Amino acid sequence: MNDCIFCKIIKGELPSNTIYEDEIVKVIMSIDPVTNGHLLVLPKEHCVNILDVKEEFLTHSFKIIRDNLYPLLKEKLNCEGLTLAENNFLGQAIRHFHIHLVPRYENDNADFVGNKDMLKELDEVFSLLTK
């Protein structure tokens, strides 16, 4: 895709702080981090959402996260946990699927805030999902 910023980064046309790269995936530092060490895992092949992603990327990227990236973040940044997120279309400016790796630290204030009003609809949503 010609105008995709992530595709340009993958091709080396734009700079990035690359942490890891192989033939399937490129991992870069987020330029808008939620916490220190916030990384983005990008498939090298352009795709818009998780439904477009090849299974090879999914299995490979989670292996890289488990075996390489999470241990690196724990060792170098002393994070206590890791939040993985894919927020397609929810505030996402770049239409190229990616996985956010957000290192978690005590008192990092990066908590997900739930909506207690949604509890009223829990049974209705459960029913819809299990029909």
Which residue ranges define each predicted feature?
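HIT superfamily nucleotide-processing domains
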Residues: 1-131
